[in-house]
Amino acid sequence: MLDIRFVRESPDVVRADLRKRNDLEKLAWVDDLLAKDSQARAMQVKVDELRRRRNEISREINEARKAGKDTSALMAEARDIPRQIKEAETEMEESRNKVHYYLMRLPNILDDSVPVGKDDTENVEVKRWGEPVQKDFEIKNHGLLAVEHGWADFERAAKVAGAGFYFLKGNMVLLDMALQRFAMDLLVKRGFTPVTPPYMMNRKSYEGVTDLADFEKVMYKIEGDDMYLIATSEHPIGAMYQGEIFEEKDLPLRLAGISPCFRREIGAHGLDTKGLFRVHQFHKIEQFVFCKPEDSWKIHEEILANAEAVFQQLGLPYHVVNICTGDIGTVAAKKYDIEVWMPRENTYKEVVSCSNCTAYQATRLNIKVRDPKDFESKRYVHTLNSTAIATSRAMRAILENNQQKDGSVLIPEVLRPYMNGLEYL
């Protein structure tokens, strides 16, 4: 969330950002937020003054009694102070709650390099790598191809769990595992520490990493518990150090999460409806970095380069897009997507999201870094995250781009050591 001090000092920056996002509803919140904040602070002053007066009256009553003076007026005032304090505290709490409500829902301040646009059609391409694959035969649907070869079973998975699930079998399981291990090994060589997080989170922690008002509809809630299945390892790793203070020497902290991911909402989009691209459960390797504020933009480019290296070494053509104001969401100050070439649809499809969240998550979670020259001086860290690989989407890309005329699939060379030297699926 935004720091209330920033909103107080720079309300016009907040308003300009919301206009850039064309978020008129939240733009209308800013004046009320400032008014409620002012009211809460005024009530705090009033409460402090009433408490001071309460102590002062006690002394005055004692002195009056010693002097044999009438204390009835002072006693009446003293009896009324608790009521006044309670009223002021109630008003203060109501105002603070409203301020907190607004702050938890206002989006991050966008970087100036984020393009203005209404939706994903106005994202801006910034880079291409590789030549889009063109085949001289009709490419089979990856889901049907997987079923034909006995690599996947969607029908039986639907009987067991419903639509959007799958059984992987045989060499497809090895491919899934190979992709995870390949991506993790790449990150470890680049200074990341592997992390297996809890696969469930409580609501308080989840509210720290994302706006549940936007995100809750895509998540699985555990009935009867204040717990959710994770949608990505980014979320538990982001909340891992909540309420803690880093020393500068320990930053940047580069973590590589490995986990299954669970998503309720998968959509229904043409050729994606049966297969591995839009599913309720998949495996993902995620990059997450805690760093000093002055380092975050350099690290944003670094984690993008890591994700690009994954797809370059897999030999899968892709492009990078700079996500526009109408598509970026609440948390990121800037986001890149990598979209890989899908030759059957003759288009690029998203496989990586790479975000610099600046201090937005750290403010919600109260994660700071201490100034090494001033023990009492602390500031919020910056957090960044990026997919390294989501295996279900990468497998679809491999099944399409590397599909052969006879229906076999060429395994990317970098994965073969993880698959017992197998060359073709």
Curated annotation (Swiss-Prot):
Positions annotated to bind L-serine: T232, S233, E234, E286, T387
Location in or out of the cell: Cytoplasm
Top-rank EC class of the record's enzyme: ligase
Gene Ontology cellular-component terms listed: cytoplasm
Source superkingdom: Archaea
Subunit structure, as described in the record: Homodimer. The tRNA molecule binds across the dimer.
HAMAP family with a match to the protein in the record: Ser_tRNA_synth_type1 (MF_00176)
Entry remark concerning the domains of this protein: Consists of two distinct domains, a catalytic core and a N-terminal extension that is involved in tRNA binding.
Protein name: Serine--tRNA ligase
Lineage of the organism: Archaea, Methanobacteriati, Methanobacteriota, Stenosarchaea group, Methanomicrobia
Originating gene: serS
